[in-house]
């Protein structure tokens, strides 16, 4: 029997209608896996050995009672076959420390989804620089004068921090906007932090597409997140509306170009953000949108994921 651990935010607070981690647990349970639940505070390191307090778990699609803890134990993480790291950002120093603990288990043979080193290496915004032929025009800088020159060149730009999620602190600065200076100062904290500028993509009106990639293979359907009227952010957390769709030709092209690199880096479950035919982000920490896509199309994304995990476990 496969023992699957999951590190996540408190399961008591999730919305099971939309939660991708919950969907993964349902599929793992359906396959007869033993489920071990952990929060960040359960992980620890003693003399180089990664351990945790885990609670064995059963889950069900029931809005009144969706989980039950069936036991509690303290065990070496190496006792688990696979661990899903599903803690939501912020990607802060605490998150980084947890990846070192998970990496000690990985060294003992546990499969970690996604690979701890790659979680540290691949910032969701900056990792797109490795695929710059697919992205909008992009500037990463602390320098206000460079941001101003970029804005003057493109006249309509998006500014964002490198560590936001859910559309937080994303600004659109149009031609003639008097606020560029103060936005640049705010995002760079007066030149002490990097921020990202990209030319505005009018295709955002048709949605910001979340394309999921499972161990290098694109899922054939995506979720287009369509901004509310007058809004430039499609994120569901920012009030956008989700619309599942089949991938377009350019979506396939982008996902197939990036897929092999993701697979090689042990990034087994990844969410690409695509606007029009441009790649804007590569989400590696805790990608979502499984449930919305599965509700609309005949595809089991969690099935693809568990198949990929089983294939990797057999190779070990």
UniProtKB/Swiss-Prot annotation:
Pathway: Sulfur metabolism; glutathione biosynthesis; glutathione from L-cysteine and L-glutamate: step 2/2. Its EC number is 6.3.2.3. Mg(2+) binds at residues 281, 283. InterPro entries: ATP-grasp, ATP_grasp_subdomain_1, Glut_synth_pro, GSHS_ATP-bd, GSHS_N, PreATP-grasp_dom_sf. It catalyses: gamma-L-glutamyl-L-cysteine + glycine + ATP = glutathione + ADP + phosphate + H(+). Keywords: ATP-binding, Glutathione biosynthesis, Ligase, Magnesium, Manganese, Metal-binding, Nucleotide-binding. The keyword Magnesium applies. GO terms for cellular component: cytoplasm. Its cofactor is Mg(2+); Mn(2+). Residues 125-310 form the ATP-grasp domain. NCBIfam families: glut_syn, PRK05246.1. This is Glutathione synthetase. The gene is gshB.
